[in-house]
Amino acid sequence: GLSKAALAKQSGMSEIYLHQIFAGRRNPSRSRLLCLCFGLGASLEEAQDLLRHCGCAELYPKVRRDAIIIFGLLHGMDLFTVNDRLFSEDEETLF
């Protein structure tokens, strides 16, 4: 399995923040949830399920930023690669 330390690193967040999310003491933003999806290596379907479950808007391919994120999820990119692509396309990064 993936340790909390490794998940935190791959998700671009601190272990403390990650622990607070899992303990229900934090209500992460849509972008933070997507960071977590990349850290977990989630599929697009799993990411959409998590967003829906947490009451966030699903990724929508006609929105440029979302399309870049979808591409990253479909191609198994890591969070940092997707963030670089978002930045280079003048879109808001995930963190």
Question: What does each of the following model-derived ranges do?
Answer:
Residues 5, 16, 45:
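Key DNA-contact positions within bacterial/archaeal DNA-binding proteins
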Residues 10, 39:
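Residues within the alpha-helical elements of helix-turn-helix
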Residues 1-8, 35:
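Short basic helix-loop element that most often maps to the first helix and adjoining turn
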Residues 11-28, 53-55:
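Recognition helix of helix-turn-helix/homeodomain-like DNA-binding domains
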Residues 48-77:
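Short, charged recognition helix plus adjacent turn
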Residues 25-38:
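Short, basic-rich loop-to-helix N-cap that marks the start of a DNA-contacting helix
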Residues 1-4, 80-95:
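A short, Lys/Arg-rich alpha-helix, primarily the initiator
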